[in-house]
């Protein structure tokens, strides 16, 4: 599908859908708990469905009633899946599921779409082997398809976390192992996502300790208890509308966002305020009004998912903006550094690549035919660019939005946006 976008005056109020990070973690934890859990306001997207499918394969049941999941969890001993588990496009579901598979007394095989079959999982595979499981990639290239055999027991491993999902997988599953686990971290990107995982462990009474996130100690023999929760809004999805308001000099009100939540992408609000946007907070409502933005250097390591949207914001900021220290952005669904450089160039941006980021100078953008590369964040970021430049912008692979924000087009239209799926 294609997304056709024209310059629009956007203002009004948008309710942000549930957090993907919280939704998928809650789905896995409900499955690992013995008993019935209730998850309200989950994200309903293809990524979340992938998480449900992974957990169902291990023996839990998931029923969606009135936009809430009722989960009957399998507990600490997942069953052997009846078939290969296809995670679709969900890297989170794959990586969290790998260590869950190491709890199984038998074999589990994971695969996914063409993007998943290129994404790195080597360090996590190595860690599973070190903790007493058996794991290997079928092509020997550190990417899915991957075979896991449990049951892991615990022990010591080093872990190179080019993505925080490796550590989250270990943290969520090792409390259920027989022995204690000691993880030494050699590199850790995206720390706020680990903080979300630790928030869940705290909520469910799991014991652990860490040394400034350089070493983690997780006692074995623990159990998850069933729980009820309400998923907060997704700051990563809200980023597109934060940028939209900041560059348009109009006001948007974003609702269903909890500033006390550990999601890292709420930092985008402070960044945009520092660049010149006007931000006001009223309980769970955030008012954003654009003013003249000024370029600056921004360390994106903790908020890599915001890179595509911030690249668009930088095109409208006076002077030069440098988005730096985010090499892991090259390892997402696409190489987001390269892709945003190439597609914004088509729209007239003065932009160049760094090994770990982008350099962007104020630019006068124009509409163009651009590629979305089957990447939800690329598609939606280019749509925001198209809403704020002359001419018509057409973006391919628009169906990728369903990964995290199926209602994106409706949200834009509700505030006056000229946007259409064709």
Swiss-Prot record:
The active site is at residue 305. Phosphoenolpyruvate binds at residues 20, 91, 119, 165, 336, 377. PROSITE patterns: EPSP_SYNTHASE_2. 3-phosphoshikimate binds at residues 20-21, 25, 163-165, 305, 328, 332. Pathway: Metabolic intermediate biosynthesis; chorismate biosynthesis; chorismate from D-erythrose 4-phosphate and phosphoenolpyruvate: step 6/7. Monomer. Its main location: cytoplasm. InterPro entries: Enolpyruvate_Tfrase_dom, Enolpyruvate_Tfrase_sf, EPSP_synthase, EPSP_synthase_CS, RNA3'P_cycl/enolpyr_Trfase_a/b. One of its GO terms (molecular function) is 3-phosphoshikimate 1-carboxyvinyltransferase activity. It catalyses: 3-phosphoshikimate + phosphoenolpyruvate = 5-O-(1-carboxyvinyl)-3-phosphoshikimate + phosphate. Belongs to the EPSP synthase family. Keywords: Amino-acid biosynthesis, Aromatic amino acid biosynthesis, Cytoplasm, Transferase. It comes from Ruminiclostridium cellulolyticum (strain ATCC 35319 / DSM 5812 / JCM 6584 / H10) (Clostridium cellulolyticum). HAMAP family: EPSP_synth (MF_00210). GO terms for biological process: amino acid biosynthetic process; aromatic amino acid family biosynthetic process; chorismate biosynthetic process. Its EC number is 2.5.1.19. The keyword ATP-binding does not apply. It is found in: Cytoplasm. SUPFAM superfamilies: EPT/RTPC-like (SSF55205). GO terms for cellular component: cytoplasm. Catalyzes the transfer of the enolpyruvyl moiety of phosphoenolpyruvate (PEP) to the 5-hydroxyl of shikimate-3-phosphate (S3P) to produce enolpyruvyl shikimate-3-phosphate and inorganic phosphate. This is 3-phosphoshikimate 1-carboxyvinyltransferase.
């Amino acid at each position: 599908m294609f997304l056709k976008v024209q310059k629009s005056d956007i203002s009004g109020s948008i309710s942000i859908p549930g957090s993907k990070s919280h939704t998928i973690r809650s789905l896995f934890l409900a499955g690992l708990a013995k008993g019935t859990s209730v998850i309200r306001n989950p994200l309903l997207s293809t990524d979340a469905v992938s998480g449900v499918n992974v957990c169902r394969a291990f023996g839990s049941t998931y029923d969606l009633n009135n936009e809430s999941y009722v989960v009957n969890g399998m507990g600490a001993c997942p069953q052997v899946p009846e078939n290969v588990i296809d995670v679709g496009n969900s890297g989170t579901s794959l990586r969290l599921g790998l260590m869950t598979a190491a709890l199984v007394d038998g074999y589990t095989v994971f695969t996914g779409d063409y993007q998943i079959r290129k994404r790195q999982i080597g360090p996590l595979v190595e860690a599973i082997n070190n903790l007493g499981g058996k794991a290997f990639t079928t092509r020997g290239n550190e990417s899915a398809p991957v075979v896991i055999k449990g049951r892991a027991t615990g022990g010591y491993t080093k872990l190179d976390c080019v993505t925080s999902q490796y550590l989250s997988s270990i943290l969520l599953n090792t409390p259920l192992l027989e022995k204690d686990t000691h993880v030494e971290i050699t590199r850790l990107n995206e720390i706020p996502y680990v903080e979300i995982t630790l928030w869940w462990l705290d909520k469910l009474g799991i014991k652990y300790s860490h040394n400034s996130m350089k070493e983690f100690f997780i006692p074995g023999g623990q159990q998850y208890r069933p729980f009820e929760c309400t998923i907060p809004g997704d700051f990563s999805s809200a980023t597109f509308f934060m940028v939209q308001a900041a560059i348009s000099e109009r006001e948007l009100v974003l609702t269903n966002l909890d500033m006390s939540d550990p999601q890292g992408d709420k930092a985008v609000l402070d960044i945009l305020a520092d660049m010149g946007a006007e931000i006001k907070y009223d309980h769970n409502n955030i008012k954003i009004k654009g003013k003249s933005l000024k370029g600056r250097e921004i360390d994106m390591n903790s908020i890599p998912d915001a890179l595509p949207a911030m690249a668009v914001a930088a095109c409208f900021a006076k002077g030069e903006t440098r988005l730096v220290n985010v090499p892991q952005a090259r390892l997402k669904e696409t190489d987001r550094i390269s892709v945003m450089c190439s597609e914004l160039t088509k729209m007239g941006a003065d932009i160049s690549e760094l090994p770990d980021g982008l350099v962007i100078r104020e630019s006068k953008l124009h509409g163009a035919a651009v590629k979305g590369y089957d990447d939800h964040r690329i598609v939606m970021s280019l749509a925001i660019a198209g809403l704020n430049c002359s001419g018509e912008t057409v973006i391919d692979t628009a169906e990728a939005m369903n990964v995290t924000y199926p209602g994106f087009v409706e949200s834009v239209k509700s505030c006056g946006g000229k946007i259409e799926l064709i």
